[in-house]
């Protein structure tokens, strides 16, 4: 069994921030996603895949992250979700491009918005961005906001 205490701490801090600010953060994320993708904000739902359903490309994520950093006064590290999932994982996050069982467990904890049926054996690390939704970025913003006030 993998020690997920730090990952769980991140999730708990995110949940605490979202307890009082989810709608506010989601509204800003939704607007930023719509602007980046040049679509009507009504088309952005919390769990729609930004890549598979809304047509985002990797360059769009750079623009989105910049907009979110500006809107919330935060810094979002490149590959933030992946880095948090890998932190302290001695067994390795991936092997030959395939996310390990320990890595999948970490992603399930960090990304509760993702249908666990998508995080199964054989999942490739390059597929992680296909999991990203507006809700993923809501949680990412909350993580960075929480880290401003704690050591998470």
Q: Over which residues does each language-model region extend?
A:
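Phosphopantetheine-dependent thiolation modules in NRPS/PKS and related acyl-activating systems
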Residues: 2-56, 60-66, 70, 74-152
